[in-house]
Amino acid sequence: MIVKICGLKKAVDVAAAVDNGADMIGFVFAKSKRQVTVEKAHELAKNIPANVKKVGVFVNPTEEELMAAIKGVPLDIVQLHGQEPAKQANRTDAEVIKAFPVKDGKIPTNINDYPNAYILLDAPAEEYEGGSGKTFDWDKINRDMLTKNKLIIAGGLNAQNVQEAIKRFEPYAVDISSGVETNGEKDPEKIKCFIKTAKGVE
């Protein structure tokens, strides 16, 4: 199972994720309590080996902002968490994850407008997009609409429920942020526990 640890701001947290087998490291450039600058992400990225993909999280960015981060960090993947047009997701300079909020079990109808992107399903936003710590209603999802080899599950995951999520959705990857935090800060022990638990289900 591919595991993405998102919202990292400190070298110690990046090390905990990398050392325990994370496959993707997420840096949040959108307005958030987990926001980092391109310069900070560049410094943190120096400690990430080439086989671990660096992901930048954005909400309705300009093309200039995307390109600056892709080159400046550098990023392997951009994660679009807003209402970005399909043409912005159709790019060659980075892979793309397109996030969709799932409300009342309904998958947005425009999910098929992004055929080349990984599709990330998340809980509905609160103050900021993503990182709410809440799950969406797993029971109501029509899984026939989903392409498993492009599917990423996020929203309220933790070491206690990730195995259930993997069994239900058989996704390409799982994505976590607040579920590996204690008092709003990343917790290296929770990072380790989550990765080990997620990768125990194949």
From Swiss-Prot:
Record-level Gene Ontology MF annotations:
phosphoribosylanthranilate isomerase activity
Q: Keywords on this record?
A: Amino-acid biosynthesis, Aromatic amino acid biosynthesis, Isomerase, Tryptophan biosynthesis
User: What pathway annotation does it carry?
Assistant: Amino-acid biosynthesis; L-tryptophan biosynthesis; L-tryptophan from chorismate: step 3/5
- Enzyme class, broadest EC rank: isomerase
Which reactions does this protein catalyse?
N-(5-phospho-beta-D-ribosyl)anthranilate = 1-(2-carboxyphenylamino)-1-deoxy-D-ribulose 5-phosphate
Family matches, as Gene3D superfamilies: Aldolase class I
Output one GO BP term. L-tryptophan biosynthetic process
Extract the PANTHER family matched here. N-(5'-PHOSPHORIBOSYL)ANTHRANILATE ISOMERASE
Which family does the record claim for this protein?
Belongs to the TrpF family.
What is this protein called in UniProt? N-(5'-phosphoribosyl)anthranilate isomerase
Give the species: Listeria monocytogenes serotype 4a (strain HCC23)
What gene name is given for the protein in this entry? trpF
